[in-house]
């Protein structure tokens, strides 16, 4: 019995570990370190219709508990991803989750329609943290009605299951999750980065050229755990959790909160072997915990007692 195997919509995972979109590119650099077939899945870099060169530099800044980034969805565009990146990834025995982004609903739909036809793409991850240029730049993922409409449109054209990536930069993430589930999403991935900023004390100017960026790394892990804990009790679709994972213990904590699989982001920059190392460490930890299969961990923190949501002091 494979104690780490996980079944999700569109995804038969040999283990629940995958690199998060944006922290792994298309895997070419990491393939120099280990066989990518060891991974449960690969979430590739966000793809837009046309190539994007991203934001001006500097666009990365370290923080005491992680990092800020304002890359700006730099990617080679849909055509190159279909013609070069996905065929290259086909040599590995690993399902691909294609991250879809855009500036308009029409762009999301077009990218989703074409990329979902690729033979090694088993699911889509809808990046709804992008600004909607037709609505004054407000992010798709901050208004439940807009997020739901986008989800529904993409579901209508996608040939594979659709997972929606939730932004933590909202007032009520449970309300957002429920709206997206009602619109037909097959699963959720959460959380995306939190908005943050750093200022140079010598120049009094923002360190990032974009001024603000997305905070990731260990600093956001408690927030991710809390949000997954709340959302997993409110929806029936599976959650792929992410946000500051660095160890096998972190993975189990995410499962206890309600995740069914996890994605590892910033830690890949610190240790390129972090994913295969965690995969190797998980069976040892399961033995220590007296757990036969990782699926037994899902939601254990709330399934044993009363469902609870923190409402403030």
UniProtKB/Swiss-Prot annotation:
Chemical reaction(s) catalysed: (S)-dihydroorotate + NAD(+) = orotate + NADH + H(+)
Active site at which residues?
130
Q: Provide the residue positions that the database annotates as binding substrate.
A: 45, 69-73, 127, 192-193
Query: What broad class of enzyme is this?
Result: oxidoreductase
Q: Copy the pathway line from the protein's UniProt record.
A: Pyrimidine metabolism; UMP biosynthesis via de novo pathway; orotate from (S)-dihydroorotate (NAD(+) route): step 1/1
Residues where FMN binds: 21, 45-46, 99, 127, 165, 191, 217, 243-244, 265-266
InterPro entries of this UniProt entry? Aldolase_TIM (IPR013785), DHO_dehydrogenase (IPR050074), DHOD_1B (IPR033888), Dihydroorotate_DH_1 (IPR024920), Dihydroorotate_DH_1_2 (IPR012135), Dihydroorotate_DH_cat (IPR005720), Dihydroorotate_DH_CS (IPR001295), Dihydroorotate_DH_I (IPR049622)
Q: Signal peptide: which range, if any?
A: none
Q: What Pfam families does its record include?
A: DHO_dh (PF01180)
Q: Which cofactor does it need?
A: FMN
A GO molecular function held by the record: dihydroorotate dehydrogenase (NAD+) activity
What EC number(s) would the UniProt record show? 1.3.1.14
Keywords assigned: Cytoplasm, Flavoprotein, FMN, NAD, Oxidoreductase, Pyrimidine biosynthesis
A cellular component term, taken from the record's GO annotations: cytoplasm
Cofactor, free-text remark: Binds 1 FMN per subunit.
Query: Is Ribosomal protein among the key words of this record?
Result: no
Q: Which family does it belong to?
A: Belongs to the dihydroorotate dehydrogenase family. Type 1 subfamily.
**What does the annotation say about its assembly with partners?**
Heterotetramer of 2 PyrK and 2 PyrD type B subunits.
Q: What does the record give as the function of this protein?
A: Catalyzes the conversion of dihydroorotate to orotate with NAD(+) as electron acceptor.
Question: Matching NCBIfam families, A to Z?
Answer: PRK07259.1, pyrD_sub1_fam
**What's the name of the protein?**
Dihydroorotate dehydrogenase B (NAD(+)), catalytic subunit
Q: Which organism is it from?
A: Geobacillus sp. (strain WCH70)
């Amino acid at each position: 019995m494979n104690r780490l195997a996980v079944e999700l919509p569109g995804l038969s995972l040999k283990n629940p570990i995958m690199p998060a979109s944006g922290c792994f590119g298309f895997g070419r650099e990491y393939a120099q370190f280990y066989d990518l077939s060891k991974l449960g899945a690969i979430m590739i870099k966000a793809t837009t219709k046309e190539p994007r060169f991203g934001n001006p530099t500097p666009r990365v800044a370290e923080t005491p508990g992680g990092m800020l980034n304002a890359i700006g969805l730099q990617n080679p565009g849909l055509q190159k991803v279909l013609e070069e990146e996905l065929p290259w990834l086909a040599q590995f025995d690993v399902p691909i989750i294609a991250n879809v982004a855009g500036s308009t609903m029409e762009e999301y739909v077009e990218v989703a329609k074409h990329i979902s036809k690729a033979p090694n793409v088993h699911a889509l991850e809808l990046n709804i943290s992008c600004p909607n240029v037709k609505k004054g730049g407000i992010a798709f993922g901050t208004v439940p009605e807009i997020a739901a409409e986008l989800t529904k449109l993409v579901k209508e054209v996608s040939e594979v299951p659709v997972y929606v990536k939730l932004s933590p930069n909202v007032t009520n993430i449970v309300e957002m999750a429920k709206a997206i589930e009602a619109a037909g999403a097959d699963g959720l991935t959460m959380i995306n980065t939190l908005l943050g900023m750093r200022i140079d004390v010598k120049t009094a100017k923002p360190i990032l050229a974009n001024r603000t960026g997305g905070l990731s790394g260990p600093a956001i892990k408690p927030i991710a755990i809390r949000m997954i804990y709340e959302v997993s009790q409110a929806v029936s679709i599976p959650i792929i959790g992410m946000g500051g994972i660095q160890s096998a213990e972190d993975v189990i904590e995410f499962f206890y909160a309600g995740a069914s699989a996890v994605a590892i982001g910033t830690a890949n920059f610190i240790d390129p072997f972090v994913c295969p190392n965690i995969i190797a460490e998980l069976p040892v930890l399961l033995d220590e915990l007296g757990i036969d299969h990782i699926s037994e961990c899902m939601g254990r923190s709330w399934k044993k007692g009363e469902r609870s949501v923190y409402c403030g002091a």
